[in-house]
């Protein structure tokens, strides 16, 4: 349930500029910011796979998560993101499309980005959601998220890039307030000026009353990206390799599904 919060903010993160997004990852944002007066429009689609469990805890619901994002450069080291999330759900109780909610995020570099060294950025976001993506039911949920981005390019003679993100947040709904934590990592190799290949890992957890672990999971999978001057596309596929608790009457407890494919398309202007 709470995992949707972090996916909302990580679905389309990257560098926004007159050129296309050069972040080779679909789940991890890089330590870059849009330049003043420049924009980027991004559309992400996450296709979920899993068992249709019907009523009850529907952790294996199937469908699509969509996020439309506009990045607006405010200065040389900061930008703001406007995000609209929607979805398509196929379950025993709900079949159809819906507008889930929106989010506003501010991102700022820590220092000046430079090659051959660690680069960092931070972001703060507010989100509002009116539909539960796991069930299609209407409800009101507000969220507050903080994110830290670290990026390392391994020199001008190396084509490797490493990114890690740490996200923490609070989610409040009719059931109360819970804490969420997500840690993502990505390692990619830039084969040429257009193609990149890599692997990503996403670990996440949700705590009720800030002290009781409700669920956690670890997902790993490959990613591939293609970039042109003003266009880029990234595809990532994740499999759940572990989770806690692992079963509930034989059912998987990951909030979305045991397998998902995420596609991110970006245009710079």
Language-model features: locations:
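Transmembrane beta-barrel domains of Gram-negative outer membranes and organellar outer membranes
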Residues: 19-173, 178-184, 188-269
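Cleavable N-terminal export/targeting peptides
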Residues: 1-27
